[in-house]
Amino acid sequence: MTRRTALMVGVARLLPAYPAKEFWNDKNPSDWNAEEIDLLLNKSPWAKDASISYYGGQNGPLSNSLPGERSRSSRNASSGTSPSAASPAAWKAIIRWQSALPVRLALKAEPSPDTEKFYILNMVGDVPSVGATPDEDAAQRAARFETLKQVTKLEHKGDEILLSRVEVAPKNNLSLAGTLFYFSRGLALRPEDKQATFSTKLGPIDVKCKFTLRDMMYRGNLEL
């Protein structure tokens, strides 16, 4: 087990299965305590454990580094194995709806015009990075992003919102480093859509996470 996975497992064990009370609707953000912020960022309607399927092979963009870490050669520094050879149980991730207002309030994030234009989802955990590597040239990066666009989507009721942009989210005092996926808000999600599903492929793994939209209400509004 890597240090990153151990940290995530430790957080999961400390957090209840689901908040007993929707404190985000009952308390002002300035009154949220550290435990409540952890809940909102790691186990809440806006932050869910991803379902990860390991199938071997490599269909999809893959960097040997984890988000926020320097590129490795062909070996995983913490386990001594390449990412594609790692045990399926080693892959852990949380998908966090980073553009949602309560998440931004918990992170004390600065206002950004991107949150008005995009649904932004953050994949945090012990999974391969899709960030650029130092030995890539511009053409290789562009080709890898095109591949990523083909395998990454946000779905609801049969409609697909395709990937617009991807970038690394740096580590801070509230969150591990992650990968940000940007999807256009041109196709608006509504509570009656019931569910939205994020999915992508990273080398040997499929990553999927389902969100229940009616649970993602904040002060009477669907916040995504």
Segment roles from a protein language model:
Residues V11-A17:
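Hydrophobic h-region of N-terminal signal peptides that target proteins for export
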Residues Y18-L224:
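PEST-like low-complexity, intrinsically disordered acidic/proline/serine-rich tracts
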Residues M1-V11:
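N-terminal secretory signal peptides and thylakoid transit peptides that target proteins
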